[in-house]
Regions:
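Hard-cation-handling environments
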Residues: 1-18
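C-terminal transmembrane beta-barrel domains of outer membrane proteins
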Residues: 21-179
Length: 179
């Protein structure tokens, strides 16, 4: 479990600070405060089956620049949505995952999973949006040097983006190498 607070250094003027949000022209608060929190739970069953859940969120009474707002969509958020597809000053998201046993062949490991992700954000204006998805994924590693992650998420509850509709699928994938 974790809790963190972030704030500005009491510098800047709102007329200058608004230059960070030329898209939405939201007039962000120059002296903002944000409280962020998170908690997680992991349980390993017999025969290498695993369960994991995580909750994260934030609260702010101020209008925030885009970089400080809570973002829901993406590979590390609500999978099945594009990165940061829904944003707000206040929000929470939850991830629930079930992992199948690891398959090993020599130095290679492969594990499959199923997941449900959901979240809700509220903007300073008072508008709120909730989104959710469900899907499956793979985690693979070769020695300790290479890893692969792939998640395919199906939108269960769509947000405001007319190009991300209920029933749509999106794949998030990454390949990493450590030297």
């Amino acid at each position: 479990m974790d809790v963190a607070e972030a704030s500005t250094m009491r510098k800047g003027k709102s007329r200058n600070f608004a230059t960070y949000d030329k898209v939405n022209q939201s007039s962000p608060t120059p002296r903002y405060k944000v409280v962020r929190y998170g908690a997680g739970y992991f349980y390993a069953f017999a025969n290498d089956w695993q369960f994991r859940t995580a909750l994260s969120g934030q609260w702010s009474g101020d209008t925030l620049i885009q970089g400080e707002q809570m973002r829901l969509g993406g590979a590390d958020g609500v999978r099945g949505f594009s990165e940061g597809s829904e944003t707000g000053e206040v929000g929470a998201r939850m991830n629930v995952e079930g992992y199948l046993p690891t398959y090993e062949a020599g130095d290679a490991k492969l594990r499959a999973l199923v997941f449900w992700d959901g979240g809700k954000v509220t903007a300073k204006s008072g508008s709120s949006i909730a989104i959710s998805s469900a899907g499956f994924g793979l985690r693979s590693a070769y020695t300790n040097q290479y890893s692969f992650r792939m998640d395919a998420g199906r939108i269960m509850k769509a947000g405001n983006d007319p190009q991300q509709l209920k029933g749509d699928w999106r794949i998030h994938a990454s390949l990493s190498a450590t030297f």
